[in-house]
Design a protein with these regions (language model features):
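Catalytic domains of carbohydrate-active enzymes that cleave complex glycans
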Residues: 229-392
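Extracellular/periplasmic catalytic domains that process cell-envelope and extracellular macromolecules
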Residues: 59-60, 125-128, 200
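Feature activates predominantly on carbohydrate-active enzymes
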Residues: 1-65, 69-107, 132-135, 160-186
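Substrate-binding cleft/loops of secretory-pathway carbohydrate-active enzymes
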Residues: 111, 115-139, 182-187, 215-223, ...
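Structured mid-domain segments that build the active-site/substrate or prosthetic-cofactor binding neighborhood
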Residues: 37-47, 54-55, 153-254, 258
Length: 392
């Protein structure tokens, strides 16, 4: 589902509800009106949200609404917010009072606060059944989890504290490298361990934040596995991966399975996966160049041998991983994994480097492969830079 459609208010979208009237409810920060944050004790704020719900969803439906401050580190400290208990970096008191008021006004709807930045502090009162919390896992490192690490204990304690005041605990977690959608990101075994911990400590729902509508390598397989783990986090990950590849890739199933599960096992080293990682960090964590390059170079044979849907999917994967091959080559420059050799003062690009570029140009044939990261950096521009500055 599109969260903007299936939730009455989703994420940090409260300003969409307020529209031009947002200026009436700007926060007071350091004694001055500040348009970077909102005031949650404002009567105008309550009335505008109330009208929005009545006009668009009615009073008898069962919709969900997130009431969250903007993603900034400061809270409103106007006289009313301060009287409720707000401090410079804690908006929990005022946000809680607004949510409680809305939950009483609309008992059929459900309202969520967040546990992130200015609302990290847990509420100090029992919440009604139609109120919950969405806990951000942004600060919980993506790495092997055994429940004994200090970061594991810290996040588990946060969930336990929320469990004391509500049974409606959702987690907002992350499953992609947002600087590079195209390089493989072996998150499945780590995600399984996190799901087990979340469930053990009272979570009742999980949101996985991935690449959205943009293509991400192995994404269909990962979606298949994660969907199964959301139902039962005890299922064996390797068997789920094998099941998907057996079903969708009759020719290349073993080759894909062997390489992808190797990536997953590499990621179990205990090193942190970077949510915003360059190729060098990925290489240090799980993407061993020699193994990846062998896999990439073998791909052409499997594309040629496969037929129909499998061939199209392999061609799509080959195209996306050409970006990874080019990033490795760019980073390694003139060594065994690079794009060129030095000949005295001259630099001689390898013949295969132009083949990588040609292969990546085929991204236009595939839906969702226009950008390679969260910032919407265009693959076409990346190719242009290679042609103008690296291979020129």
């Amino acid at each position: 589902n599109n969260f903007d459609d299936s939730w009455g208010i989703w994420g940090h979208n409260l300003r969409k509800v307020l529209g031009k009237d947002a200026e009436k409810v700007y926060a007071t920060i350091h004694g001055k009106t500040d348009d970077s944050q909102l005031c949650f004790s404002s009567e105008d704020m309550y009335r505008q949200i109330e009208s929005y719900i009545v006009d668009n969803f009615g009073e008898k439906g069962n919709f969900r609404f997130v009431i969250a401050p903007d993603d900034t580190p400061y809270a409103c400290t106007c006289a009313t917010c301060a009287a409720l208990g707000n401090t410079e970096k804690n908006a929990t008191p005022a946000v809680t009072e607004l949510i409680l008021r809305l939950s009483q006004r609309f008992p059929k709807h459900t309202f969520f606060t967040t546990s992130s930045l200015t609302t990290q502090q847990v509420i100090d009162k029992q919440l009604p059944p139609n109120v919950g919390v969405i806990v951000s896992a942004i600060d919980y490192p993506l790495r092997r989890t055994d429940g004994k690490d200090e970061q594991d204990k810290k996040f588990a304690e946060q969930l336990d504290n929320w469990k004391k005041v509500t049974n409606n605990i959702y987690i907002w977690d992350y499953i992609n490298n947002f600087d590079d959608y195209l390089t493989p990101f072996p998150i499945l075994k780590i995600a399984q361990q996190r799901l087990q911990l979340f469930k053990q400590h009272g979570a009742s729902g999980i949101f996985f934040n991935g690449s959205g509508y943009s293509y991400s390598s192995f994404d269909e397989m990962r979606t298949f596995v994660l969907s199964a783990l959301l139902i039962n986090p005890e299922l064996p990950v390797d068997e789920l991966i094998k099941s998907y590849f057996n079903q969708e890739y009759p020719v290349s199933k073993k080759w894909l399975y062997d390489y992808y599960t190797e990536l997953e096992n590499n990621a179990q080293s205990g090193k942190r996966l970077g949510l915003y990682a360059g190729i060098r960090e990925s290489e240090k964590g799980f993407l061993y160049p020699e193994k990846f390059i062998k896999f990439y170079d073998e791909m052409g044979d499997f594309v040629s041998e496969a037929k129909g849907k499998e061939r199209k999917k392999l061609h799509e994967l080959q195209t996306s991983l050409s970006f990874t091959r080019m990033e490795l080559a760019r980073d390694h420059s003139f060594d065994a994994y690079g794009y060129a050799k030095r000949n005295g003062k001259d630099i001689q690009p390898l013949p295969q480097a132009r083949k990588w570029v040609t292969q990546l140009k085929e991204h236009q044939a595939f839906a969702g492969m226009e950008y390679y990261n969260e910032s919407a950096y265009e693959i076409d521009y990346y190719i242009k830079e290679w042609e103008q500055y690296i291979l020129a």
